[in-house]
Amino acid sequence: MNQNFSSMIDQYKHQQLRIGSVSPKQIHAWANKILPNGEIVGEVTKPYTFHYKTNKPEKDGLFCERIFGPIKSGICACGNYRVIGGEKEEPKFCEQCGVESVDSRIRRYQMGYIKLACPVTHVWYLKRLPSYIANLSDKPLKELEGLVYCDFSFARPIAKKPTFLRLRGSFEYEIQSRKYSIPLFFTTQGFDTFRNREISTGATAIREQLADPDLRIIIDRSLVEWKELGEEGSTGNDWEDRKIGRRKDFLVRRMELAKHFLRTNVEPEWMVLCLLPVLPPELRPIIQIDGGKPMSSDINELYRRVIYRNNTLTDLLTTSRSTPGELVMCQEKLVQEAVDTLLDNGIRGQPMRDGHNKVYKSFSDVIEGKEGRFRETLLGKRVDYSGRSVIVVGPSLSLHRCGLPREIAIELFQTFVIRGLIRQNLASNIGLAKSKIREKEPIVWEILQEVMQGHPVLLNRAPTLHRLGIQAFQPILVEGRAICLHPLVCKGFNADFDGDQMAVHVPLSLEAQAEARLLMFSHTNLLSPAIGDPISVPTQDMLMGLYVLTMGNRRGICANRYNPCNSRNYQNERTDHNNYKYRKGKEPYFCSSYDALGAYRQKGIDLYSTLWLRWRLDQRVIASINREIPIEVQYESLGTYHEIYDHYRVVRSVKKGMLCIYIRTTVGHISFYREIEEAVQGFCRSYSYSYGT
């Protein structure tokens, strides 16, 4: 990133950056700069960093001050100081060393470049899947790798000059006849002439194949072939059908890739490098640790390796007249491998290691991963009005609520609490308000609760892989130091309660708060945005708890009363650990669920005790009763009788008909039913409030 580019971002307030291929002309524009004396600098030609005696950057090296700017602001390589931006008409550079008098921060964005002696294929576009070069050229990846690393040669498809040999297609360079009949009879100059006329190998062959075809023609031909394959239909052979399907998928990817190149104004031949950009020195520093021992970034060593091999190839092509062509092609392969290691170490097999058997970190290692430049440095920045803590389960919370510890909440909403204290004339200035907050006076917590009632918060769990990774909640104060979360929202966050941490953010603007309420609240994100399946589903521990709550005694009254195994102890009196006496045959009766739960709280009955609960009369229940035959009918002297069924009994009167119904249940079933009933009623109230009914 050069100075013009960074100033453009500041001037126009751009909100995004696009990463992609650039032309050699653009790389020149980034790196080249014209000194006041008219000299153009920017090319790095030497693999050196600092001089071992003077400890100053080497000229035209990886840390050259002429290319990347001064190490200290206003001080040139000679040690002379000049005022930056002075009004006097003094030269802005040193005439002796050629270093500009600018701010040293220029070394954070001023780039350089290495002029490669031969084209080099960008390994990301060749070896990464999908291989863009293979897709666009419609050739097997293995054949392209053979061309890139000089194992194959390719006859030029369009002979623009007279040819001496009739070569067609690609041929393996390792064949003995070709190996001994082509390169060994030429000097360096003669072999270059032969290659320019007859054959093409290395990244040069890839560049020619990418530059020749028109992208629109590729799209049209791929579309025609795709339609022809679709019209053929099934062949009856599964292998052939799968082969045709893979070919159609490949054609679709090829058309999409060509359209992307056209849409972004990127030329396919830019995937082959002629100029290699050199990062600014501050992004690949050399520092001194304890004892004065220097520590260098691995990128510097990989750059040095590229420069060494590139300079060797340049010498072979320019100074040596009798170098065999075999040696030239071998050196081109070494340059390609050095650039591959710089961009992505280990992508072609065993990674390059240093003297301590440690793998060098390449560009890919610096960028990707959790500790890479994007996730750790750019996306992992700390922001104001945010906190972080461990999450624990909050079973009593509503789906749209979360529990914030007092320590976190008072820090997040401190400015709002200060404003509330001043508005209510409880503090005359900000200092007194902060002192009340430090002393944790009771009025502070009251104002904090008022502020939190109308202010949602955002919870985020890294990595945020989809939009449900950050959701809005209505906060409430809880004790402790952990964030309480409803267990049903864990699936959207891909979180569990084994030590996971989540970040909490406070939306400040009205637009952010409105977006949080309308789009990001957890109770409005119940379905997966990808496939539409429910995302808020009970977890395994919740299902286990519901099973334990409702298991009770699953056998009916008939099985309990007339089972031979129970007849022996049927009339025996039993005393439990709470000294509550009851008979198995005389199960308690309750008029309402409140009475049953009250007896459970007073330890009169346990969670699984069977009981009879009076139930409201319902036409659907009456209709189902009329279709069943009772197990037993008990008559009383006052004209009432009891019809006993498997799980309920009906009290009838000879004169008045059905009087009431008792169902046979447990305290666990009652608790579960009441929770479901309250949830349904709450949903109906919110639905009617939202739609004004």
UniProtKB/Swiss-Prot annotation:
Cofactor binding: number and manner: Binds 1 Mg(2+) ion per subunit. Binds 1 Zn(2+) ion per subunit.
EC identifiers of the protein: 2.7.7.6
The protein's enzyme class: transferase
One of the record's GO cellular component terms: mitochondrion
Complex formation: In plastids the minimal PEP RNA polymerase catalytic core is composed of four subunits: alpha, beta, beta', and beta''. When a (nuclear-encoded) sigma factor is associated with the core the holoenzyme is formed, which can initiate transcription.
Described purpose of this protein according to its UniProt entry: DNA-dependent RNA polymerase catalyzes the transcription of DNA into RNA using the four ribonucleoside triphosphates as substrates.
Protein's name according to its UniProt entry: DNA-directed RNA polymerase subunit beta'
Organism: Nuphar advena (Common spatterdock)
Gene symbol of the encoding locus: rpoC1
